[in-house]
Amino acid sequence: MAKEDVARRRSIRAYARPVRQPLVWALDVEPEEGRVWIDGEALWAADVVWDLPARGTVYGLLLNTESQRAAFQPKMTAPPYGAPPAHPVLYVKPPNTLLPTGGTVALDPDVAAVAVGVTVGAVFRRPVSRVDAQTAEDGLLGYVAVADLFVPHDDFFRPPFRTRARDGFTVLGPWIVDRAAFFPDVLRYRIWIDGRKATEGEERWVRPPADAIAAVAAFMTLGPGDVLLLGTPQAAPLAQPDQAVALEVDGLGRVEFAVARRGEGR
């Protein structure tokens, strides 16, 4: 059997929107190798121009990785809070933040560098509301690798729009891996800046995905195309203008983008 045929037999189902295609396509992908099959043709993912695979509202969970929660534990138990939050702590990444893999993030003049958070996004295929953890993932299309960018800051207790809602600060991977083909119990990741590995690790969730979805859906409806970011590790390397960033999430694939300086007066 040809090597290419063997690779395709290892492939999994995913959903994507290559540029010039009007709809989300169901594709065969091999995330670890960066291979994709479109119209029967095997291509390298890096050679395809990708559009956004999801276009709904993006919500992010704070304090949902063990490393981040541990880092902020002293502040959570200090006045005026006195105890860790009992409910999910959310932020919103509005449409202006969305950028497909391969794009360029233009930093404003007041931002010297951007912190590169890596996470998994749960993408919904139908409305999900008031569900329990046992059925929470039934409404998912699948999962996508995400670069969740933010301006470095130390305070999680104020609205994070200025630090997290800037243009291009949510870089989505090329495809959504079908939920039946990915088990997001652990986040295993690597981040490179200018081709040099900046960090790698393994991260566990405070609330596992099903529990996190159920906790959020207890008070709001998550709609088709919406994305719930499950949390970022505390360690987030910094990228500056004129640098190239790549990250990988095991089982989901690779996200790439460039960092530039937004021109004065733009």
Predicted regions span which residues?
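Glycine-rich nucleotide phosphate-binding loop and flanking beta-alpha elements
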Residues: 65-67, 98, 130, 235-236
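A short secondary-structure junction signal
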Residues: 70-72, 102-104, 110, 130-138, ...
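Catalytic-pocket segment enriched in acidic/His residues
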Residues: 30-53, 68, 152-266
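Short Gly/aromatic-enriched secondary-structure transition segments
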Residues: 74-80, 133-144
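Hydrophobic alpha-helical segments and helix pairs
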Residues: 81-136
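N-terminal non-catalytic cap/leader segment that marks the start of a structured domain
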Residues: 1-88, 180, 196, 244-248, ...
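Residues embedded in well-ordered beta-strands
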Residues: 119-123, 144, 190
